[in-house]
Amino acid sequence: MPYAGNLPTPTENKVSQIISIISAYRHRSAAVPDRFSEFAPALEKQLTETVSKGEPVRFILPSFPFKAPAEGDKRKTLGSLPDKAEEIALQTLDAFADSIAEIHQPGATVVIVSDASVYGDLLKIPDADAFAYHQELKKLAASLGLTHLEFVRPGTLAGIVPEEAKTLEEYSDHVSKTRNLLDGTLAQAVDPNEDENMRATSKHYDTALPQAEDHEAFKAAMLKRGKAYAKLIASSAESTIRLSIHESNNVGKITMNLFPPPTSPDFITPWHGAVAVLADASVRIVDASTVDRDRFEVITNHEGRPWLLREKSDLFDWFGMELDFEPLFPCGMQVRPKEGYGPYRFEDVNMKLVRRLALSTAPLLLRGFTMQVEKEVFRSKARELGEIQMWPFGDILEVRENADFNMNNVLTREAMPFHYDGVFKTVQDEKTGEWISVPPLFQMFRNRAASQSKGGLTLFASSRNLIPLLGPDSIPLEELRKLQWETFTAANEAFGGHKLQLPFIITHPESGVDTFRFHEPWPESKCVPGSSEPTLVRVVGWPLAESDALCEKLTRLLYDRRVAYRHQWKAGDFIFNDNAMTHHTRTAFEDGHREHWRVHVN
């Protein structure tokens, strides 16, 4: 980005950050060359104008038409209404916009334009199904509290209908008017090979479209309607940034990944697939028609709607308890009593199952469980999980504001850096005299109070989500594997005082997979005088400027909303967290009381 003078202006800085976020969320197709760098100057110009005027950044995404129709006795989805797949995709889009709003105060919005009226007749989708899908999609976004999404239909966008349809009859009328426009004044000749993006869409249709007697004619009709639709979008939303869910070269429009990594390795959209929770608790988007129904069961939501697929496993069979196992966004899992059941006693929870599940998905949240003789039970259940790691203060730490015990910023209301517990927990090698970091494997939390109205979130960032994002924009995994980082924080009553050199990538002590290790640099400028101390971090053997740049990129990945689950505590919550697989942090809070107990287990 060109500098105005020696240093970038605040506007240039902000535009550069926004472009970095857009770049990070884009899909790089294996079938089409990625030419995002060619589009970046035009994007920079558009964003500079938007930011300079103090206007919100607006994106437009044609998508979410309806669930793919059944082909004979096969169906890629679980039904005709939104389910867990749409939930995750909407959360991803809202997180994308929220990331921009965090650095650009006027905010950011993704306008979702439903494709239903564009393709519904060609794919033989009843208006009633498309209308119900759209209405339920809006309800889902509202129930999730997603504030950066808007929903509109093409006719309303083009101004040919006065407002959004509220009834099926109004919707059918709007659909008719929209198709007349697309097949009339907006219709254009189309060549499947006219450019890279059209070729990619044409190739996609070769396998994605339902079987037809004349496939080429069917595909041509879809491409022609799509080209007219693109013209409608371009003419109706000139000040927006065009997003896409089709494979493209990322010029003129930016193809989005709608799911966190590694959820959708096959680039399946939510209306062409279903969420599958595998036996190891990992989450994938799959073509439901390819799933072995003897191995998987359909899980319904509280309304009885088919919601996701789950592989049959004793991991999800907690004897005597009727439970929901719900994937969290973008990582982790919540376990809670099914509606009409519970609360269950924490004393009765099988900690062997908890340990297995927590090693498969992190963090693991238990909500809706009671505990009677508090500390005695908490300590006893921790022992069932594994060997408790002791600290100078004992085994259970009461994490609340406490100025009488110096643990850096742990027992304050301050924000904390992203870290993993025990990085500064050390033992001295008897032979070499070297100080060795001995972090615990598990964290076990029990929330006692969470009355703060704002802030006080705990963020958990999973290596399973972060490592797939390593690459040219940050640093490739194999390069990072060769590097070490150096860190130091001053000694306090529990830890610190020794300079450490540690690898960025380690092998998980139980699963054997790669996991990321780091501590967010925390300079004195982020500390509260008299309350907390800085933590110094740099890449071993690198010049300071290059080290700072890499540390900034890695820190940005930890905060990426596709990587970090943002937990708002409720009194009574239990969290079991794989400390080797994740990092965590706390956001600052001002009012209210926040307290939980923490114990470390190996």
From Swiss-Prot:
EC number: 1.-.-.-
GO molecular function, one term: oxidoreductase activity
InterPro entries assigned: Isocyanide_synthase_DIT1, TauD-like_sf, TauD/TfdA-like
The organism's place on the tree of life at top rank: Eukaryota
Gene3D superfamilies: Clavaminate synthase-like (3.60.130.10)
Enzyme class: oxidoreductase
Keyword terms: Oxidoreductase
Family, similarity comment: Belongs to the isocyanide synthase family.
Known role: Isocyanide synthase involved in the biosynthesis of isocyanides (or isonitriles), a class of microbial secondary metabolites. The presence of an isonitrile moiety within a compound imparts unique biological (cytotoxic, antibacterial, and antiprotozoal) and chemical (transition metal coordination) properties and enables synthetic and biochemical applications.
The protein, known as: Isocyanide synthase A
The organism's taxonomic lineage, starting at the top: Eukaryota, Fungi, Dikarya, Ascomycota, Pezizomycotina
This protein's encoding gene: icsA
